[in-house]
Amino acid sequence: MTAGPDPAPDTSAASSPSPVRERAESVLRVLVGRDDVALREDQWRAIEALVIGRRRALVVQRTGWGKSAVYFVATVLVREGWASWRPGRPTPAPGSRSGVGPRSGPTVIISPLLALMRDQVAAARRAGISAVTMNSANAAQWPAIEEQVRTGDVDVLLVSPERLNNPTFRDEILPRLAAGAGLVVVDEAHCISDWGHDFRPDYRRIRTLLAGLPPRTPVLATTATANARVTADVAEQLGGTAPGLRDAEVLVVRGTLERDSLHLGVRRLPDAAARLAWLTDYVRRAPGSGIVYCLTVSAAQEIAERLREAGLEVAPYTGRTDAADREQLEEDLKTNRVRALVATSALGMGFDKPDLAFVVHMGAPDSPVSYYQQVGRAGRGVDRAEVVLLPGAEDRSIWDWFGSQGFPPEPEVRAVLTALDEATREGGGPLSTNLLETVTSLRRTRLESMLKVLDVDGAVRRVQGGWESTGRPWAYDAERYARVEAARIAEQEAMERYEALEAPECRMAFLRSALDDPVMPAHWRCGSCDLCGGLVLKRAARADDVEAARASLARVGVVLTPRRQWPAGMDRLGLPALRGRIAASERAGTGMAVGRMDGLGVAAALRGLIEQDDAAEVPLGLRPSVLQVAERLTALMAEDGDDTGGDAGSDDGPPPSGVVVIESRRRPRLVRQVGRALSRHLSAAPLGVVGAAGEPGRHDVGSAFRLAQVARSLTLADWSHEALTGLQGASVVLVDDWTDSGWTLAVAARLLLRAGAARVHPFVLAQR
C-alpha cells in the first residue's frame, strides 16, 4: 500500500501540483502514517483517470507497489466531491462528504478472500474511511449495512465475488449498490480471466455487473499477477461490453515486476526425506518468519507435524482450516508468534506481512505466474528475503490432477442442461445441486463451478432452492477450452524450465519474461538469485538429519472415518433404499489406511503400487508398514465401542476374527496377497471375497454416481452357506487396495453386516 519499503518523496511531481493532487497526497500520508511519502506518477495517473476522468482503469503492478492506496485515495476524493470540482471553484473541505449523492455513493470493492477484506478494512479505518463488509458470515447484518449505505455513512463496502451469485444479494441488493456506487473496484482481477492461474467462476459475473453500471461510473481493476494475455483479457472485459465505452478508453497502468529484495533459489534433492531434512535445517536457521508452501492439504499437515516434532513453532494453514483459526494464525505469523505457517495456496492473495523473511515451496506450483504471486508475499518491507523452491518427483502428477478439474466435457454439461430443461417444462421447480449430482458423473466442486459458468453465460439461473433453466440457447466453446488447456500445459513446462535453469541464466529474469514484464531490459540479470551469486544455499542436509527425517516419514497410518449419510436423490438412480442416515447396524466402523497418496513418506511407494494395473504384491520395503498399520487397526477395534457398525450397544470391540477381501478387477493378486498376510498376522480366519460384477467403475465421478456404481456391482452372491455361517457374529477386517470416496467400503460393509457380521472395520493400502 505504501510507495515501497522505504519510500521517499516523489521529486518527479510538478512543482505546483493541482489542488486535487495536493489533497490526494495528504490522504496518502494519513493512509500510510508518514509525512515523507508522495504518490508515484503512475499512481496519480490512475487516480486522476478515476476521479477526474471517471474512466475505467486496470492497474497491473507488483506486490507492494501501492494498488490499494489508489482506490482508497480515490474513494476519499470522490466522497469529498473532487470529481465535480473545477478550477475557480471552492475546494471541498477535507473530511466532508459533499460528493455523497446519487452518483457518489460508496466505493464497492469486490475482494476474493476474507483475509484480504480484513486487512483492507483495517487499512481504511486507519485513514478515517468507514469500511464494512457483506459476506456469508454476517448476512443478518445486511439490512443494517444497507441502511448505513443509504444514509451515506459507509465509504467503502467490500463484498466477495461469491455474493454476486447469491440470489438474494444479486437480485435485491446488488442493483441498488451498483446504481449508486461512486467507484467500483475489482481486486485480484486476474481471477476474471479463464486464461489466468487463479480463474474463479464467480468473477465472471463481474462482467455483467460492469455492463449494467450507470454511464461514467469509474471502475478500477487491480492485480499483481497477469501476463500480457491475461492483461488484455481483463482489459477487454472491463470495457468491451459497457454501453458507449470503447476498449481503448480503458487505461492500463502496467509496471515492472522486478523485486530487488527477493533472492530466488532452487535446490534439487533426491527424495522426500532429504527435502524435509533440508527444510527443517533451513527454517531453524532462517532469520525472521515465513511461509512454507505445499501443493496438497495432506502434505501441509504432515510437514507441519514433522517440523513441530523438530522443535519448530509452526502451524498448518489450509482450505480446511476453520475461518476463525485462519484469522488467528495470520495474526500469529504477523506478530512472529510462529516461525512459519505451512500452507497451501489458501494463504495467498491479500496476506500482508511486510517483513516476511522467507518463502519455501515444498513442491512447485504449476505456473510461473502462480509462483510469482506466492513468493510476492515476501520482502515487501525489508531489504532481503529468501525464496527457495524444493521440487518434488510428485509435482507433475499433482498438477495433472488439478488440471483434470477444469471445465467438463460437453456431454456432462448437456446432461445437466437437459435435466434442468425437463424440470422447467414439467413444472417441477428448481433442482438442487444434490439432485443434479444424480444426472452427471461430476464431483460436487466441479459441478458447482460448471453451474456458475452456465449461470453467467445465461443458460441457467440460481434461485432459492437450487437451479433452473433459462431456456436460452447455449453453445459449448470447445475451441476456447482447448486453448485454455494448451496454455495450462505450456505454463507447466515453463515452470519445469525455471527449475532447470543454470548459470549464467537468471531466475528473476525468467519470471519477469514469463509474465511479459513490459520494461525488462535485454540481457538483464537480477544479481540476487542463486544463479547470479546473490544467494548461497546449503547443498544438502547432514546425513544424520536425513536419516532422522526418513524415520519420521516412515511413520504410517491414516484413520478412515466411515460414511454416515447416503447422498440425496439416490431414488433417481434406481436405489431408493439408500436414503437418509446410514443405520448404525449397517455402518462400517472406523478403519485405517497405510498412508495417503498425496502426502510424503510412504506416499511415493503407494502411488507407484496403485498406478500398476496388475500389481501382484506389496513391495518388500512397504510390508513392515502394512503390518504395523494392521496392528494399529486391531488396537483401534478394541477401543472402538459405540461408534462402530454392528453391535452398537457394546463398550469395547472384540479383536478381529475374520478377514474379507473386496474383489479388484485391476489388482486382484495384490488385494488377495494383503488379505492373506493380514489373516496370518492377525490370526483371523479368511472368510471370503466381496464379489464385483461387471467392469470397475470410474472414481473421478460425483458422490451419488460412485455410490450407484458400487451398489450395483458389489455382491455376496457367490458365498456358500458355509461361508455365510462363518460370517455370523464375526469381527471383520475388510481389505481393499485404495479408497477415494469411501463408498466401496461403505457398501461392502453394509452387505457383510446385513449378512450377519457383528463389526466391519476397513483396511486399505492407500487413501487418495
Residue ranges and their predicted role:
Residues S18, E22, S26-L31, E41, ...:
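Helicase motor core with emphasis on the C-terminal RecA-like subdomain
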Residues F72-V73, L77, D233, Q673, ...:
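Active-site signature of alpha/beta-hydrolase-fold catalytic machinery across serine-
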Residues E722-L734, T739, Q767:
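Mobile, glycine- and charge-enriched loop segments
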Residues A746-R768:
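PRPP-dependent phosphoribosyltransferase catalytic core
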